[in-house]
Design a protein with these regions (language model features):
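Short coil/loop residues immediately preceding or within conserved phosphate-binding loops
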Residues: 5, 17, 60
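Short, solvent-exposed secondary-structure boundary/capping segments
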Residues: 29-39
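Intrinsically disordered, low-complexity, charged/polar segments
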Residues: 40-80
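Residue-level detector of beta-strand structural context in well-folded domains
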Residues: 6-8, 31, 63
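Acidic/polar residues in short coil/turn loops that connect beta-strands
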Residues: 12-14, 37, 69
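Short coil-to-beta transition motif at edge beta-strands of beta-rich domains
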Residues: 1-13, 21
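Short beta-strand-centered aromatic/proline hotspots
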Residues: 16-28
């Protein structure tokens, strides 16, 4: 299960493999996102609560990972 502070490994778009600490979850589509119980949620202005990110918007979610060489960014698809 993904949690902030966990060690994660991912492969970027050119095939380089990185490992590091998951530090933040971000989104191009939503202003306020969080990681809870391994699921990304966003603040819904309509319902006034956090709700899971819809499947069609999963591509807008990415994660900040602190590696030994600096900060890297990865999507769900790049984790292994």
């Amino acid at each position: 299960m993904l949690k902030i502070g966990n060690e994660v490994s991912f492969k970027n778009e050119v095939g380089d493999i990185f490992s590091g600490e998951l530090t933040e979850v971000l989104s191009d589509s939503y202003d306020d996102v969080r990681l809870r119980n391994g699921e990304v949620e966003y603040w819904s202005k309509k319902t006034k609560k956090y709700v899971p990110v819809r499947e069609k918007h999963e591509d807008s979610v990415f994660f900040e990972i602190k590696t030994s060489t600096g900060l890297e960014y990865a999507s769900f698809k790049e984790f292994f």
